[in-house]
């Protein structure tokens, strides 16, 4: 199984005080599941980690260290994918026009779509993880399992 984690799910896996933080974290640590996320997740996660430190909830350096360990290309369990900007923007624009989805949510869906096309084996289950109900609805329409 290949699982794309939207940035909301990735962030939740590091912020243990957030509801549902165990599920994405368990997915990332499961050696039998290929977990992936888009390159913008690095920016969104870092932003969330900084805000969590500013509110006194967590220490930024600890969150960042865990995230960097998980996304380390040499041995991390969360693959950060870089997709073609032109391709992802075309798909994201279509999603925004058709569904009115927020821009970054559309970008994440488009990135997941391109990632599944490139990395999923034939007949391999493709799953999507998000906290956003509208994004989840579209992912389901596209045939992705929701976790």
Question: For each predicted feature, which ranges?
Answer:
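Aromatic- and histidine-enriched alpha-helix N-cap/loop-to-helix transition segments
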Residues: 37-43, 103-107
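A general alpha-helix detector
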Residues: 10, 44-48, 91
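Short, well-structured N-terminal submotif of metal-dependent ribonuclease cores
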Residues: 1-41, 52-65, 144-145
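Helix-adjacent hinge/juxtasegments
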Residues: 51-83
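Extended low-complexity acidic/polar segments
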Residues: 2, 7, 98, 109, ...
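Active-site neighborhoods of divalent-metal-dependent phosphate/nucleic-acid chemistry enzymes
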Residues: 76-134
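Alpha-helical elements of the RecA-like P-loop NTPase motor core of helicases
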Residues: 12, 22, 90, 136-140
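Short glycine/serine- and small hydrophobic-enriched flexible loop segments
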Residues: 47-54, 113-117
């Amino acid at each position: 199984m290949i699982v794309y984690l939207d940035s909301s799910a990735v962030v939740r896996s590091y912020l243990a005080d957030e509801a549902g933080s165990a599920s994405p974290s368990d997915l990332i640590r499961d050696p039998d599941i290929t977990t992936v996320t888009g390159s913008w997740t690095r920016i969104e996660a870092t932003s969330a980690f900084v805000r969590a430190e500013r509110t006194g909830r967590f220490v930024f350096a600890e969150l960042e260290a865990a995230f960097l360990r998980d996304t380390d290309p040499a041995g991390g369990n969360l693959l950060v994918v870089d997709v073609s900007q032109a391709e992802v923007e075309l798909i994201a624009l279509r999603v925004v026009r058709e569904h009115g989805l927020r821009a970054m949510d559309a970008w994440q869906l488009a990135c997941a779509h391109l990632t599944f096309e490139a990395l999923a084996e034939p007949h391999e289950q493709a799953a999507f993880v998000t906290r956003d109900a509208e994004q989840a609805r579209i992912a389901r329409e596209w045939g992705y399992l929701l976790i």
